[in-house]
Amino acid sequence: MRLRAFLPVLFLASPVSAEDVLRVAVASNFADTAGILLVAFQHQAGVEFRLTTGSTGKLYAQVVNGAPFDVFMSADAERPRLLEAGGHAVAGSRYTYARGRLIVWSSTADDCMGALYDMSAGKIALANPVTAPYGRAAKEFLIAVNAWDAAVGRIVYGQNVLQAIQFAATGNAPTAIIPRTHANHPAMPRATCTAAVPASSHAPLEQQVVLISADNEAARGFVEFLRSDAARQEIVAAGYEVLP
């Protein structure tokens, strides 16, 4: 059963005590889907949740500095690994919950790939490669297809995926390299073209979840819930891939 069917009921759940609040940090690209999954888990477990979104790099820094999160849903595998290695997360709790893909999107070009090389094609939006894994993958792709030199002077960097989408949505950047899942984001105007970014052109976008609070049973339950058939079905429906 698709989890969206629960939505009208779940937000009517009764308030619970403060210690039952599940605090989840999630990478911006996965925020919408995480919200759906958390609402379904709320229905199942009877817990309230607080969702914090941002770039993976910034959320990672917050966890390291003691931010009170129970679960971290990253857009990469590296930050969860570092959190485990540094003693900031529960050892052995991390795993890949989704794998992402990129597209080139344009509101003006007829040839999306061609717009990357065309100096007159306007700005190109992508997330910050330093803090956002999807931005790093976009940069790797541009280098792999020999478009970096033509594109670098035209790039506008969003702090995260959602800000990069905002640049495209407002027309500040007619071309964007964004997650495939956001091609039809409500904020986006109609595309004149889209093109799939070859997965071989960048490091895999393996998104991992890791448990931060060892003693929070709701957090452990949610991390396990993400492995369920219903959760995996929702993740795939959102446009991500899941591992076997």
Language-model regions, residue ranges each:
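Sec-dependent signal peptide recognition
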Residues: 2-9
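Absolute protein N-terminus
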Residues: 1, 18-19
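Exported/periplasmic ABC-transporter solute-binding proteins
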Residues: 19-53, 57-67, 74-77, 81-90, ...
